[in-house]
Amino acid sequence: MKTAVDKMQNEVDLIGDGSEVHSLPTTQGRHKDLKSVTPHTVSQLLTGEYDDVISSYRIIDCRYPYEYEGGHIEGAENLHTHALIKDLVTSLQGRDSTQRNILVFHCEFSSERGPKLLRLLRNLDRKQNSDRYPFLFYPEVYLLDGGYKAFYEQHQSQCNPRNYVPMLHQDYSKQLRHFRVKSKSWTAGEKQSMRSRRLIIDSSPLKMSPW
């Protein structure tokens, strides 16, 4: 375990459990603490360009349901709540550490909702596996740079339906208010969870990193 921890401290391109380098090419995104991939890379992922290096992939669309239903990346799953992200951690998929099961998160621009839920997943994963650090159910997670908007502009043929509904679309103002109210309660719960997480990290002799 010390070897993996040492590697993670010295090599910045390793996945979350320190076992391998990232299988997808990354780009310098807005969020420096997260590994970002371009729309082109995700397009290649959809067409099987990385089938020889990964076991499976899941695209996690963190937008609100009306945005997702208005148009999303082929095969993407609409997981926009904390409860749904928690289910990812407790699900069976991703538990076999010998397989490379990757996740790609995004929202409209990948500026707020996507990054927040990606970080939530990693924090929950670390907490769930705090007794066997640095093991993770999902050690390899990415953020789609530019979000759905950027992907749609470049690869519209890989969207279903071939459409893009902005979060602030005037026809969905009522739905937006509904989900924003809910998200405030989720954020309050996340802050409490993060405080508990910091206590676990601070009390660990290894001074665990969430990433």
Show where each model-derived region lies.
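Non-catalytic regulatory/accessory regions that flank a structured catalytic core
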Residues: 1-55, 134, 140-144, 156-211
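Generic recognition of well-structured, leucine-rich alpha-helical segments
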Residues: 8, 49-52, 66, 80, ...
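Conserved beta-strand elements of beta-rich interaction domains across eukaryotes
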Residues: 8, 29, 42, 49, ...
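Surface-exposed beta-strand-to-loop junctions
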Residues: 18-25, 68, 95-101
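Helix-loop module immediately N-terminal to the HCX5R catalytic loop
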Residues: 40-54, 74-104
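Short hydrophobic beta-strand that contains or immediately precedes a catalytic carboxylate
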Residues: 59-63, 76
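Short coil/turn segments at secondary-structure boundaries
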Residues: 70-75, 89-93, 116-120, 148, ...
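Catalytic cysteine-centered active loop of the rhodanese-like fold, especially the PTP/DSP P-loop
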Residues: 90-145
